[in-house]
Amino acid sequence: MNRLSLLPPGLYRICPRLPRRPARRAGRWASKLHSSVALILLATALPVEADVADTVAKVKPAVVGVGTFQPTGRPRANLLGTGFAVLDGRHVVSCAHIFAKPLDTEKKAVHAVFIGRDRQMAVRSARLVATDSARDLALLRIDGAPLPTLKLGDSARAREGWQLYFTGYPIGSILGLNASTHRAGLAAIVPIFTPMQSADQLNARTLKQARDAYEVFELDAIAYPGNSGSPVWHPETGEVLGVLNSVYVKGAKEAALSTPSGISYAIPVSYVHALLKRAALDAAEPNASEPNASE
């Protein structure tokens, strides 16, 4: 083998006729250079992944399943979505639409929070203490020992292009209480109002929706039923920036499972701060320093 071929193309072009001895030295130098570059790239890449893994390990204990529990029903536990503990560890944030259906009082059904994993699952009864139907947010209170908590960040500092993550229970009724974490690119910050296809669709209700429209996070991520209420968090700090609540569906509702669009939406955590304030609870102060965007 021609030893000159071991040189990177740029070096090969500027010294095509090196004498034999210098060529050997150049080859050894290039080999060492390649090794050094590889080590540098490895050293800079690994900590990023390690940091995310460390953050996942800190986030997951605060993420819970939410739904209903009925002692005389089958099944007794009905996992409907995701939530996460905040403040004193006895308050859980989730989505309001999860609790829209009235409880079956004949079967003594109660709102519930599910902790742990499948066979080690523990059930805590919960009660709704505040809701914001317009922003699809709910706050529950549980009794017993406090849970690990997540810190609420400042969603006003979120920027399009950030790489975020969310943790929850996709299709939890089938896959069980096993939290999974997914990456989500913050594709856009958009009004939640859906434009009408024709003037015939304009009425008092749609006009009010347009007037009251607020901005949400559009995420480049696939989410499934059960992910509603998942915290959307920053990989460096673990701070919650949003609450996953919906997906864009192409066609019928069933398409959310069969042909997911890859477009999901999250409610900015600023509305969680407002909900806690309205419930006379003190939320954690947002971090004063702006986190760096993760590429």
Segments and roles (model prediction):
Residues 168, 239-240, 274-280, 287-295:
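C-terminal recognition in membrane/secretory proteostasis and scaffolding
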